Regions:
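Nucleotide-sugar-dependent glycosyltransferase donor-binding/catalytic pocket residues
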Residues: 115, 148-149
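Conserved N-terminal beta1-alpha1 strand-loop-helix module at the mouth
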Residues: 1-77, 81-107, 122, 132-139, ...
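Short, glycine-/small-residue-rich phosphate/pyrophosphate-handling segment
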Residues: 125-129
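Alpha-helical hinge/cap motifs
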Residues: 143-146
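Non-cysteine beta-strand/loop elements that form the S-adenosyl-L-methionine
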Residues: 106-114
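Short, flexible coil/turn micro-motifs enriched in small/turn-prone residues
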Residues: 116, 140-141
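Short, glycine/charged-rich beta-strand-loop motifs at protein surfaces that mediate ligand recognition
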Residues: 115-122
């Protein structure tokens, strides 16, 4: 099952984490600070294909493999696909309703499937509900949120892969 490493603001050895990913995996470079996001993208470039979160200008500038959009910008996918047809375009989603607007995307990251420390207080979908949602999606769905080596086996085959933060950091 392909893996997606989602970076966050913590100071971690993201390059080491990216090097450990199996072939076919990607890294989503996230972060609020544009200078830090640029520095991280430059560090990771060439280690694994990169999707830049919510920053199409940076994605184009560094020659990223694509763009990751927040759920609220999912409808922009067709625009970015037309402008950069070679890009992989993904988005986050948190409900079946959100996934119904995902037709122009290559994949969606559905979250949170399990309880997660990165979004304290967010109510998990649960594996059963998440599997139902993923099974009705018009595009491939990756499970995100609290996914670990211990609970990944509880995910249904309706998922195309796993996206994670903490469980992929060395």
């Amino acid at each position: 099952m392909p893996l997606v490493l989602m970076t966050d603001a913590r100071k971690a050895d993201w390059a080491a984490a990216a090097r450990r990913l199996p072939r076919g995996s990607v890294v989503v470079v996230r972060g609020q600070d544009s200078k830090k996001r640029l520095a991280l993208a430059e560090t990771l470039y060439g280690i694994a294909p990169l999707l830049i979160a919510d920053d199409p200008a940076l994605a184009a500038r560094i020659g990223a493999a694509g763009l990751h959009l927040p759920e609220k910008r999912m409808k922009e996918a067709a625009h970015w696909r037309a402008r950069f047809p070679h890009w992989i375009v993904t988005s986050s989603a948190h409900s079946l309703r959100a996934l119904m607007g995902a037709h122009a995307l290559d994949a969606v990251f559905l979250s949170p499937v399990f309880a997660t420390t990165s979004h304290n207080g967010a109510k998990p979908l649960t594996p059963l509900r998440a599997a139902f949602i993923a099974g009705h999606a018009p595009v491939p769905v990756y499970a995100l949120g609290g996914v670990t080596a211990q609970n990944a086996a509880r995910l249904a085959p309706s998922f195309s892969g796993i996206a994670a933060i903490s469980s992929l950091i060395p």
